Structure formats: structure tokens, C-alpha cells
Amino acid sequence: MEVVGDFEYSKRDLVGHGAFAVVFRGRHRQKTDWEVAIKSINKKNLSKSQILLGKEIKILKELQHENIVALYDVQELPNSVFLVMEYCNGGDLADYLQAKGTLSEDTIRVFLHQIAAAMRILHSKGIIHRDLKPQNILLSYANRRKSSVSGIRIKIADFGFARYLHSNMMAATLCGSPMYMAPEVIMSQHYDAKADLWSIGTVIYQCLVGKPPFQANSPQDLRMFYEKNRSLMPSIPRETSPYLANLLLGLLQRNQKDRMDFEAFFSHPFLEQGPVKKSCPVPVPMYSGSVSGSSCGSSPSCRFASPPSLPDMQHIQEENLSSPPLGPPNYLQVSKDSASTSSKNSSCDTDDFVLVPHNISSDHSCDMPVGTAGRRASNEFLVCGGQCQPTVSPHSETAPIPVPTQIRNYQRIEQNLTSTASSGTNVHGSPRSAVVRRSNTSPMGFLRPGSCSPVPADTAQTVGRRLSTGSSRPYSPSPLVGTIPEQFSQCCCGHPQGHDSRSRNSSGSPVPQAQSPQSLLSGARLQSAPTLTDIYQNKQKLRKQHSDPVCPSHTGAGYSYSPQPSRPGSLGTSPTKHLGSSPRSSDWFFKTPLPTIIGSPTKTTAPFKIPKTQASSNLLALVTRHGPAEEQSKDGNEPRECAHCLLVQGSERQRAEQQSKAVFGRSVSTGKLSDQQGKTPICRHQGSTDSLNTERPMDIAPAGACGGVLAPPAGTAASSKAVLFTVGSPPHSAAAPTCTHMFLRTRTTSVGPSNSGGSLCAMSGRVCVGSPPGPGFGSSPPGAEAAPSLRYVPYGASPPSLEGLITFEAPELPEETLMEREHTDTLRHLNVMLMFTECVLDLTAMRGGNPELCTSAVSLYQIQESVVVDQISQLSKDWGRVEQLVLYMKAAQLLAASLHLAKAQIKSGKLSPSTAVKQVVKNLNERYKFCITMCKKLTEKLNRFFSDKQRFIDEINSVTAEKLIYNCAVEMVQSAALDEMFQQTEDIVYRYHKAALLLEGLSRILQDPADIENVHKYKCSIERRLSALCHSTATV
């Protein structure tokens, strides 16, 4: 801590600095809570400003006012002069405007009152400030923390340019800030105290508009502007009040004689009037089709109104919600009670805000049993997607008004609701009634307190289409997943299966257990997790899901919207959903109303569905066909739904298509799934307790893996195929599961390292195609190794053969994706330097000469027994080694600098030790060691050369690595251009790229700006040529 009299400060607590001084924040040595600002002025600067400093000290001692910064002490040390002044904890007005942008008229009036009070003191003592600007107007909060505007104290500071200027006196010194200088000051004319009034006018204008009234690029341009324009008229916004506009026009007069004087300024009506009277908020008089963007700016006081405080708004809401209306109100009229209530509770800060009547609120609702008398048409209800249905309050008489962008969807919704209401009765024959319930559930699906009460069963309506009015996507009906009534049975492998679910028809309404069809093929059963809303069995449920699941519907009349009585329930698919577009792949496999409990035997799984897109068609085309083994139910001949797999045999295609209709319903937008190239079988383990984070694939295999209970027909075992979808790392074994209903949920966010079995994909997705491990797929024992015939083909390309195992693996996310920018920039720089040094090392190897070429040259020279030829050959070799040594030394220097940079960045925490960083640092270290080794070897070989060839010392000193690299790059480009001219275009692109990389690295190590500019121009020309080559190649 630095000591200044009774005060102390730390040089780290820098507040700001000016042209002559530096300001620190300090405190009293005994009273540590007394904060001060210590202004340090170096005596070296006092030669020209000593007089100004004396004036500032004298003026500050004389001025004692709450709106002027106080001077506590003056201390003179051998090298500096310290002024201990009052500390303002709110910063300056410039910072305040930077944060707020503009200020309201009420705030401007509060600030201007205090500025005027300070100017009154200055004017009474004949002092002109001459440097009034936002940076010299400080803000201080009384409670040492930011509060409302009324708690801000304005203080004028920095009287370094102030001087005594009594009446009838003029000054001619040019000082201050140009944008806030009066025109007479910047034009070097005589001026008086009215110059401060101009500065105050510019400050007020900036508070109102956000920028000074007159600006220019330089003081000279501003001076020329003032000289050319005899009359100046600032652009004042239209919504400005008349008093403030008059004040600004009076202060911003170019001619000081026409400018407002101090007495008129102190007694101006804008300062004398109170705050703008706030009007009570009024309800909206009518519905508006659109809101104008300038509606707020058209009101003079709308711009300056602040939002109501939270306690006031809570008080308004409590009183408005305490007395609900008895009858349906007319929204175009306002009752006297509501107007009086709002006027009582309206705050002065709620000007130009509109309070919507409480009967529109969606937070409170009451359920109304809809009978024959109170039933309305279904198009009067606004349907919202959610866990529960919106409840119609008894006072919502008006029809909902759709959003303009959703008119088509809304019309489609009305038609669907109308057709639904008139489509007939439910299973029991009770008429359908239109009850739509407002959502009372939390985002996780739990009921909120005060939830809607149950509706009688005879009035409950079954709405079979999932509707959404808040999305711009096309409407797509999607029924809920049908499940099987609660039963306990044994699967084909002997594993017990427990179920706690209700069977629902395609419209989502509960179906009595006695009338629920038992449509299963393999005896497997779908499960449903119990939800808290199951206690209301007669309530309609609307769920908003990312992708609509496939609904295995039941055959029979009354269970679907299709006009054909024998067709199963409708299957909705959204045409805008694309394969892979969902943010989570697990959303395709699992759709549950509540989060799935790990290890629970009642986890809900919706059948897997691939949307109808081009990508999905390609995926379905990869799935082969198998013949199903039928298993009749005990109570009828209708086939059971197969939750495990759908096996289609080529010779029995027609029979399989007929059976598939019982499993997959007709899609509204895509047609029959049986018309596709194949079916997607699904296998699921209902009793699995594996963790959700386990990286295991989803194996889809025929039932033969369970011991032949559902074995395929004869002759099909050898040709059976399966599809394996994997994300992340593969398992250790490629063996099929031991149970037909085993379904292992994959982790879709796995980006970790692979296990000992190796990763199928490192950085990009690819497809693994191979043959099954044995003639009977799934017959290999657990722990068996993967099939040796697996092979990889590029992801997205058609595999050469559909024989065997097909694996789709998504690309893993690189670690650097989630890193900070400093990490990625440093890593990019390290990679560039690594590639650059590798290119330099290639050039260095070329400089040394090829050993084969040297051998051929020796054999050639052996014919000519000439001593001169031997000397020239030896000299060229030694000279090449000199160039090699220089290049190796430069490469070692660059590699060492890169390694030091990486070490420093890792220590500072800016560079994370990721896999990519470790790899590049390892490569840099290896190259560095290699360069050091080569430097040692070349130095030993060149010792004799350096000792014998002293006359070449000057030439050797002129050899620089930068020059060698530049010449090599130029030669490389020239040779590539020459080859291009002769149509020898084999590797010219590679050479161009290498030359551009050399120049890029060279621009990073050069120091001379001219050299850097030349290298940059050369590199740009190479890049243009590369671009032209790529364009011509693409055209061909």
C-alpha cells in the first residue's frame, strides 16, 4: 500500500487517468470504510500544468457543495503531487449512458436539477468549468450500491481547466473536449461562461438521444462545420416534451448572444415542473389484428415510462383474481369495478401499460361438466398441446382468434374437431362430448396443486387427434400407443413379464379390458409406466412429442377414423420430420409420459418408427424380409401383434402384407408401410435392468435366438439377416441376446473413448457390412468374437452387398467442440506451426540431396579424373549442409516456441489437455528432438568446412532460413505453374497448397511489415489460383 498522509492506496486499484494525472481508489488509514479518490500528478508534467494545478486546488478548496467533488487533502512528495478527493462509487455519466443507452425525461430532470445546483455555485463565484462532459460528471450512490434514480447524487469533477472569469470578461484559451465545446471555443473566439451552458445542452441531448447533437471525424472538421453553418438546429425527437425541447433549443444556440443565460436556465419550466403525471392503466378497448412497431414511440411519455414494480403488479393480480366474474363478460367493455380496482392499485410507474382483464388468464380455470344444455360446438374451444387438456372456463364465450401465421392449421383443426364431434359414439354408445382441459401439469407430467377435477364418465370425450396450435409445422394426426391389459405371463424364454398398463384404442381413450383385443404374434407384450394421471381413466390425454410413435392399432369397427371398418387405426407421421433430425435418437425408441425408471419392469416403450423421408426409404430398403411364424391366440383366429420382430419371407409376401396390416396401420401421409422395401423388426428386453448409460447395441434378431420357439421356416435360417444400430463404442461381443424380447437401449450422447474391442468409428460415421457369424443367426454363444468378414464402407454410400450384418454408426463428437475459444485458437496455431515445420523439414531433406543421386554423380565424376570437379562437388555438398543446418535450426526454434506456448497456456488454464492437444504436443516434441539431433550431426560434419573456408564466412552469414523458405516456395509455385502450362496436372494442387502453407508460416515469423505484406500478397495469389483450379475441376 502506498501512503499519502492519512490515506493509503494500492496501485492495482486504478480508477482512471487523464492527460496529466492518474486516479487511484484509496481509503483512510484509521477509518478503513472511508473511501477516497487519490489523484496522482507526476511532477514531470507540472512544467506546463503547474498553473492549472494551482487553480484546481484553489477552486476545489473554495467550492463546498454536495454536487461538487470535495477536496480532502493535498500532499506533495519528491516526484508527485497527490490530491485526496471524494470518491464516487457510481462511475461517471458516460458509463451510465453506455449501460442505459438513453434516459427518460424524469431521470434527466433529476440529474439536471443537481447539475444546475452545482452551476449556480460556480456562476456565483465567477468560475467557468470549460470541460463539462459526461466523463466529468460523476455518480455516487448513497447506500454504496446501485439503487433507484432518486438515490443517485451527481457531482461535478475535474476542474483542471477551470478558471475565474468574472462578469464582462472573455477568455480565448482552447481547452476541453471538441464534441462538447461551444462553437466559439472551438473556433478560437472569445467566450464567456455561456460556453458551459452549451456543454450542458450537449450532455442533456446525449442523455435523451444517445449521442451528441453535432459530430465530426476530427476537431478540425467540427470547426469547419460550425464555421460554415451560421444557424444550427439540433434534431430533437418528436416525442420530446415541449419544455425539454425548448430548453435544448435555448442551450444549443450557435451564437452565444442568442443562447439562454444562466438565470433563464435556473428558472426554466422543465426544471420547475414536477414528474410527469401518470395515467391509470386502461384495458384494451378492442382486439387488434396486428401491433404497429411504432406504437410505443408515438406517445410522448411512452418512451420514458418505466415498468411497474413487482410488488405493485402482484398486488394488482391478487385483487383482480380475488373476485371472479359471475357471468361471461364482454371484452369490448370494462366494468366500473375493474376500472376502480385498477386505478386504486396502479402505481405511478405503470404509465402506458395495459392490464389485461383477469378473466383471460390461463393460470386459473374451473371445470364445467358439459351436458346437453351447456354443450357448445367443438370449434369454440381453443385446443392446446400438453400433458393435460385445457379446461374451458364458463366465461369464455368468444371464439378463439388464431395467430395470423397459423390460420391454415387452425382451419384444419376446426375441420378435424367438427368431424370428430359428429363421428358417432364410443364403445359403450355414449355420445362424445367436447371437453377440453387447460394444462395443469408440470413439465415433468406431475399434477399441479389445484388441478382440474375429474369429469363424469358419461360426459368425457375421446379426442383422437393430437393437436397443436403453437407450432408452424403441418398438422399430422398421431394416436397414442396402444398397450395390452395388465397380465402376468411367461415369455417364450421363461422370463416372467409383468404389465401395468391399459389398452387404448387409436384415439387414446381407455378400452375396457373385456373388449380389448388380444392381438399378439409372439406372446410378447408392450408395457406402460404407471402415471399419476391414470386415476382419471375417463380423461382425454394430449401429449406433445418430438416424433410420433407408431401405433399398433386394433382391428374392428369404432377403433379408427378410417371409413373402412376393417382397416386398423390411423398412423400419423409428420412430413417435416427427417431421419436423424431429432435432437435425441432415443426419442425414436422410447415415448413415455413419465421418465423411465432404470431397472423398472414396467418401463414404457413405443414401437420404433422410421419417418417417411428419402433417408428412411433408403434405410428401410436395407432391411430384408423373413416369413413370420404365426401363433394363434386362444380366443380367436386373429393374429397377435409382434412386439419383437416382423419376419417376412419372400415366397409368402402377400400373406405377410396382410398380417402386417394388423400390426402397422395405414399412414395418413405415407401410405402403407407394406408398400416399402421391407419392415423394421424390433426386439426388446422387458425385464432388463441395464443402466441407461451402457453403450450396448440394439440387436434385432429372429426368435430363433431364444432356442427355436419362434424359429423361422425351413430353408430361411441361412439367409436370415439383422440390422444393428449402434451409437458410440461397440460391445466386446457380437453375439445376439439370449432372449427374443431383449432390447438394449443405446446411449446416444456417448463421445468417450472406445473399449477394448475397438471403436467402429473414430471421427466420421461409417457402415459395417458383413456376414452373420453362423448359419443360424444368434446361435453363437455369448462372448464370441465379431465376425471376421466384417468390412467397412463409407457412410452414406450403398454397401456392395446386403449379405450379412449391417452396422450404422453415428460420428462421435470431437472434444474441441465444447472448448473455449482460446483453447481452439491455440490448438489451431499449434497445428499450423506443426504443418509448417514439417514442410520445412521436407525442404531440408531436399537440400541435403538424394543419396542415390549422389552415387550416380560420383560414378559420373569418376570417369573425369579432375581435381577441380571433386572440389566443386565437395563444396556444393558442404553448402547444401549449411543450408540444411540453418533450416533445422529455424525449425527447432519454431518447435521450441510452440512447445513453450503450449506449456504456458496449459498452466494458465487456457489450453485444456485434450486428446488432440496431447497428440500435437507429442508430434511437436518428436520433431524438435529430431531437429536437435540433425543439428548436432551437421555441425560435426561442417567443422572442417568452417575451419578451412574462412573466406565464405560472409556468404554463410547471409544465409537465413526465412530467405531459403521463401525461395523454395517461389520455386515450387513456378514449377507447378510450368507443369500446369504443359498439362501435367498430377500434383500441382498439392504443390500449390504446400507453397501456400510455407508462406502462411513465414508470415507468422517475419518481423518486417513490408516483408509480411509481400508474403501475404503472394499467398493470396496462390489461393486465387487454387480456387480457380477447384472451380474448373468442379465444372468438368
Swiss-Prot record:
Region described as CTD-like region: 812-1036
A GO biological-process term: signal transduction
EC number(s) given by UniProt: 2.7.11.1
Pfam families associated with the record: ATG1-like_MIT1, ATG1-like_MIT2, Pkinase
Parts forming coiled coils: none
InterPro entries reported in the protein's UniProt record: Atg1-like, ATG1-like_MIT2, Atg1-like_tMIT, Kinase-like_dom_sf, Prot_kinase_dom, Protein_kinase_ATP_BS, Ser/Thr_kin_STPK_Ulk-1/2, Ser/Thr_kinase_AS
Post-translational changes noted in the entry: Autophosphorylated. In response to nutrient limitation, probably phosphorylated and activated by AMPK, leading to activate autophagy.
This protein's record includes keyword ATP-binding: yes
Ranges of compositional bias, category Polar residues: 418-428, 504-521, 659-679
Protein kinase domain span: 9-271
Sequence positions bearing Phosphoserine: S430, S771, S780
UniProt cross-references to Gene3D superfamilies, sorted A to Z: Phosphorylase Kinase, domain 1, Transferase(Phosphotransferase) domain 1
A GO term for molecular function: ATP binding
Domain of life: Eukaryota
Catalytic activity: L-seryl-[protein] + ATP = O-phospho-L-seryl-[protein] + ADP + H(+); L-threonyl-[protein] + ATP = O-phospho-L-threonyl-[protein] + ADP + H(+)
A GO-annotated cellular component: cytosol
Its membrane topology: Peripheral membrane protein
Task performed by this protein: Serine/threonine-protein kinase involved in autophagy in response to starvation. Acts upstream of phosphatidylinositol 3-kinase PIK3C3 to regulate the formation of autophagophores, the precursors of autophagosomes. Part of regulatory feedback loops in autophagy: acts both as a downstream effector and a negative regulator of mammalian target of rapamycin complex 1 (mTORC1) via interaction with RPTOR. Activated via phosphorylation by AMPK, also acts as a negative regulator of AMPK through phosphorylation of the AMPK subunits PRKAA1, PRKAB2 and PRKAG1.
Record's protein name: Serine/threonine-protein kinase ULK2
Species this chain originates from: Homo sapiens
Gene: ULK2
